[in-house]
């Protein structure tokens, strides 16, 4: 599903542990790391897409996490020209994302990034809150910065409990 402006609706998932560290996942066969994310189907709400993607990409069920924050609006990034699929219609020029900050409520061993036939990730680790800004691919960096900045008050509230 691509909107009239060429953006694919998507959810971004930031999983935080009790120490304030974030789950950082390595894309299959690459040395590229990112937060889990995925498209919103036409018959889904962003929350439904969040939980579907959470299960597919990280192996967690809704009862194993708690939503502690989400971005107010859509955050957009454009794909680099080399990544555009000009033969697909309508043309997708980027993604618009709703970001969710989740508190993980289960042991680390519950995380399973390779539990599907075609996993997105082949590894993961916990990193400090701002670490991803120095590591994510350039075209996603501004969206990551905006999401982390908007969600940090929710992270602080959780850590103060």
Swiss-Prot record:
Single Gene Ontology MF annotation: mRNA 5'-diphosphatase activity
Gene Ontology CC terms, in alphabetical order: cytoplasm
Motif (Nudix box): 38-59
Domain Nudix hydrolase: 6-149
Enzyme Commission number(s) of this protein: 3.6.1.-
Domain of life: Bacteria
Pfam family, any one: NUDIX
UniProt protein name: RNA pyrophosphohydrolase
UniProt entry keywords in alphabetical sequence: Hydrolase
Keyword Hydrolase in record: yes
InterPro entries linked: Nudix_hydrolase, NUDIX_hydrolase-like_dom_sf, NUDIX_hydrolase_CS, NUDIX_hydrolase_dom, RppH
Co-factor requirement: a divalent metal cation
Organism of this sequence: Marinomonas sp. (strain MWYL1)
